[in-house]
Amino acid sequence: MLSIIVPSYNRKAEVPALLESLTQQTSSNFEVIIVDDCSKERVVVEQSYSFPVTVIRNETNQGAAESRNVGARTSKGDWLLFLDDDDCFMPEKCEKVLQVIEQNPNINFIYHPAKCEMVNEGFTYVTQPIEPQEISTERILLANKIGGMPMIAIKKEMFLKIGGLSTALRSLEDYDFLLKLLQEPSFTPYKINEPLTYCTFHTKRSSVSTDTTNTQKAIDYIREHYVKTVEQARNFDINASYILAYPHIMNLSRKAAKYYFDIFKKTKSIKQFIITLVILISPKLAINLKRLGK
């Protein structure tokens, strides 16, 4: 059985739609664990579904990382999936994950692309994760080319073995989790080559904060714990600039240009110089470069 873990904080209204979307799964061999992170309005599920639903409420606000850890420790399934309350799984996701697990008994990690919608810009794109044989600490320090928590499945035993998500961080917890996973010698990944999660992104959303204090702390933490070589340091310096640019570009702020210019100086890439100029002209136009696969 699969366990789908959903952290929720002050988004009670999103929960019914999320559960309704899971009724479309072509396999119902899963449970759902909603971890209410001490929301102002308690999450209550009164409707019954074809799959078991458990709601756990944290007594104090713990953050998304510890909420996922709580769900994992409580879960009854052998494999863990993670879903945020503003994303959804494709109808065939659970069935395909279960098939892969059955056909590949030695694996302990599954990942796949996501279909992403830029809501305000009116277009979608599909992420392009790297192949299992390409995964290395060096490669992931350069960019997270695996995906976030809604794009992975992990054997519960492996999740607990590496200690789950770090509660020392309030940003980049999923990225840190992948890097920690790569340090485990028994890590055995498998890639499904089709998008099985649908994610939505909104530019100029009030929840996208440009305060990068927690992000900078997470960057420093990751540098201290995973960067060991000159190549790793160079790769992560480049990625840190991308990470710091993200909230600014999502807020359509020209401040993102500073970070892309930093990347240009580090890489001497003409592409990054052009992106810098595009951001200075129009951050919205820079977002639309994804429409062209740039």
From Swiss-Prot:
SUPFAM superfamilies: Nucleotide-diphospho-sugar transferases (SSF53448)
Signal peptide: none
Source species, domain of life: Bacteria
Gene3D superfamilies reported in the protein's UniProt record: Spore Coat Polysaccharide Biosynthesis Protein SpsA, Chain A
Entry's Gene Ontology molecular function annotations: glycosyltransferase activity; hexosyltransferase activity
GO biological process terms held by the UniProt record: biosynthetic process
Transferase found in the keyword field: yes
This protein's UniProt keywords: Glycosyltransferase, Transferase
Family: Belongs to the glycosyltransferase 2 family.
This protein's name: Uncharacterized glycosyltransferase HI_1696
